[in-house]
């Protein structure tokens, strides 16, 4: 079967959303597509399509993220949504679309790119497209139900579950006031700058990004701030997912100044309250600082056996992808499928 490649334009949206609903690992609604690709404050994404007879049969997309890379803010293009109609698999659809996207990303000024591939796309990225494997990201978890742990070990699916009904109450936890946030402001910009000291390379965390990524999202996220003496000491974002038969709450983001373990514990306590009773576990990718990891251990978290694939590729001759295990920091909110 033959196909041609085109850059996305709005007349293709309905067919593209239909393809993602059928075969995509991330099933975007029309509203989610507009939010993710058209309203991203870092710029509209790069979306390449394979089309045949007026139908979208393949897609590969990249989104832009403002990134602190070696201490300097730059804009990286990151592969996100990938899907190929089953009738066209084995014909090089993804490889062709991804190459076109990487050329466009390089032209846009992105010096390199990284992503979190699934088991199907990983060998294509590495063997055909020249990406390199980087240190995998280990997931941490706090079990919330003993029965959930047993089901997971036995490979048995549980109930879907979900977040509790939202509460607007402020609570005093570990000496800090933790309350829901309806909007992020300049105080998060300052907190993000302080937290960045312990993050190495990472997506920039500020009010503009958080407002778009979480509060403007069609998805259900709960955002909380921890306050000490009236000042913002930390932020947590909580969501829920059901993957591989496991009902899990997840910390999409957790931001605190390096060494502020008390703020971490206060935010985690509120996150647990949001998902307890509706999830088997609360999971996250931990911050790199030892004090924050100690706080997570005290709050009942432990490393799991699950590691997420992480790969990268230089797009310019003078760029290098840092292979060190401690060179990058990501949260689950940095993934398009959480």
Outline where the language-model segments fall.
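Oxyanion-binding "anion nests"
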Residues: 195-227
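Short, high-confidence coil segments that cap the C-terminus of an alpha-helix
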Residues: 45, 107-110, 219, 277-281
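Conserved beta-strand in the GNAT
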Residues: 47-49, 55-65, 78, 83, ...
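Short amphipathic alpha-helix that is part of the acyltransferase structural core
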Residues: 1-57, 72-78, 155-208, 249, ...
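Conserved acetyl-CoA binding element of GNAT-fold acetyltransferases
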Residues: 73-86, 246-258
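Conserved acetyl-CoA-binding loop-helix of GNAT-fold acetyltransferases
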Residues: 84, 89-103, 260-273
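A short helix-loop-beta-strand connector motif used in the catalytic cores of GNAT acetyltransferases and
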Residues: 38-49, 53, 58, 126, ...
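Active-site/acyl-donor-binding loops of N-acyltransferases
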Residues: 111-164, 213, 237-338
């Amino acid at each position: 079967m033959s196909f041609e490649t085109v850059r996305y334009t709005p007349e293709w949206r309905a067919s593209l959303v239909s393809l993602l609903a059928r075969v995509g690992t991330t099933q975007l609604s029309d509203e989610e597509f507009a939010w993710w690709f058209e309203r991203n404050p870092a710029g509209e994404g790069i979306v390449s399509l394979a089309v045949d007879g007026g139908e979208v049969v393949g897609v590969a997309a990249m989104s832009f993220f403002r990134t602190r890379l070696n201490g300097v803010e730059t804009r990286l293009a990151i592969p996100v949504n990938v899907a190929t109609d089953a009738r066209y698999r084995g014909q090089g659809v993804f490889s062709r679309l991804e190459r076109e996207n990487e050329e466009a990303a390089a032209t846009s000024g992105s010096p390199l790119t990284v992503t979190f591939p699934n088991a199907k796309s990983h060998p294509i990225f590495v063997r055909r497209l020249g990406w390199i494997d980087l240190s995998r990201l280990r997931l941490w978890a706090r079990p919330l139900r003993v029965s959930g742990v047993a089901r997971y070990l036995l490979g048995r699916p549980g109930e879907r579950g979900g977040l509790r009904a939202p509460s607007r109450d402020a609570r005093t936890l570990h000496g800090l006031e933790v309350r829901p946030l309806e909007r992020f402001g300049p105080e998060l910009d300052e907190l993000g700058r302080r937290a960045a000291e312990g993050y190495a390379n990472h997506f920039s965390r500020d009010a503009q990004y958080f407002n778009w990524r979480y509060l403007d999202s069609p998805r259900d996220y709960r955002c909380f701030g921890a306050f000490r003496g009236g000042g913002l000491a930390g932020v947590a974002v909580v969501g829920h997912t059901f993957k591989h038969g496991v009902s899990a709450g997840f910390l999409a983001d957790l931001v605190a100044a390096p060494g502020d373990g008390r703020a971490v514990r206060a935010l985690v306590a509120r996150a647990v309250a949001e998902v307890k009773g509706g999830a088997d576990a609360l999971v996250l990718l931990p911050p790199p600082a030892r004090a924050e990891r100690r706080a997570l251990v005290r709050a009942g978290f432990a490393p799991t056996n699950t590691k997420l694939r992480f790969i990268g590729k230089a797009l310019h001759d003078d760029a290098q992808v840092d292979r060190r295990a401690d060179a990058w920091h990501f949260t689950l909110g940095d993934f398009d499928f959480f």
